[in-house]
Amino acid sequence: MAIDAQKLVVVIVIVVVPLLFKFIIGPKTKPVLDPKRNDFQSFPLVEKTILTHNTSMYKFGLPHADDVLGLPIGQHIVIKANINGKDITRSYTPTSLDGDTKGNFELLVKSYPTGNVSKMIGELKIGDSIQIKGPRGNYHYERNCRSHLGMIAGGTGIAPMYQIMKAIAMDSHDTTKVSLVFGNVHEEDILLKKELEALVAMKPSQFKIVYYLDSPDREDWAGGVGYITKDVIKEHLPAATVDNVQILICGPPAMVASVRRSTVDLGFRRSKPLSKMEDQVFVF
């Protein structure tokens, strides 16, 4: 009987315990993207939330409920669309993080009538799929890699900024300060405003956001008015002399070119056309 009891214990340890671990604790999260792969994978649209007349948040499903996209913070994916028999690609930064999202990922997309990939995404119906590959990009945010991040965003260029801010807000050990200047045309164009304000509420001593509008629709608008100029950057973002500071820029090409010149005028080191992680001014 003693031998049978010993055998039973061995069976429990070898067979039963691993099964309990698997079903009680759950399967290990699996990253779907592989930087070593160069082929595109298909993911179905499972939800679409309309934010403005031409901008929506798109949620795409991953193969399994416990999968994560596998995208380092600050990097982007490449989306492919076949337009008139020709493959066209564009880069997008998901707003979701592996740390807080399983089974899906989210994209903030503004669709243009004359756009290629953005128009294709805007016409997707639930169940339709997109083809993506990645991760790609020269920026990979890590905890406390900078003491102060100055961010300049325009329109959907808020996506990588929001992703980085959310990562900082969720990490109790990350003490990085963030100052964001977010430019738009009208107040209704300010994307993710509630979500951004929620992040500020999580770390009010670290986060500061200033909104600028080209054309305010009301006289009591409390934010800034006009373009994001050198004076705006000087007033709201950290100076070039601040230790371990970095400026991040993402938005329409004209805005990016303008603020990039302004940062050089303000003493920041001029970056090369293709930004690198170590640059004092990084353009997504």
Swiss-Prot record:
Its cofactor is FAD. Induction: Protein levels are highest during exponential growth phase and lowest in stationary phase. Keywords: FAD, Flavoprotein, Membrane, Mitochondrion, Mitochondrion outer membrane, NAD, Oxidoreductase, Transferase, Transmembrane, Transmembrane helix. GO terms for molecular function: cytochrome-b5 reductase activity, acting on NAD(P)H; NADH dehydrogenase activity; transferase activity. One of its GO terms (biological process) is tRNA wobble base 5-methoxycarbonylmethyl-2-thiouridinylation. It is found in: Mitochondrion outer membrane. The chain crosses the membrane at residues 7-27. InterPro entries: CBR-like (IPR001834), Cbr1-like_FAD-bd_dom (IPR008333), FAD-bd_FR_type (IPR017927), Flavoprot_Pyr_Nucl_cyt_Rdtase (IPR001709), FNR_nucleotide-bd (IPR039261), OxRdtase_FAD/NAD-bd (IPR001433), Riboflavin_synthase-like_b-brl (IPR017938). This is NADH-cytochrome b5 reductase 1. It holds the Pfam family FAD_binding_6. It is an enzyme of class 1 (oxidoreductase). Competitively inhibited by NAD(+). Inhibited by mercurials such as p-chloromercuribenzoate (PCMB) and HgCl(2). Enzymatic activity increases under anaerobic conditions. It is a single-pass membrane protein. Residues 38-142 form the FAD-binding FR-type domain. The lineage of its organism: Eukaryota, Fungi, Dikarya, Ascomycota, Saccharomycotina. It catalyses: 2 Fe(III)-[cytochrome b5] + NADH = 2 Fe(II)-[cytochrome b5] + NAD(+) + H(+); 2 Fe(3+)-[Dph3] + NADH = 2 Fe(2+)-[Dph3] + NAD(+) + H(+). It comes from the Eukaryota. The keyword Transcription does not apply. It comes from Saccharomyces cerevisiae (strain YJM789). Pathway: Protein modification; peptidyl-diphthamide biosynthesis.
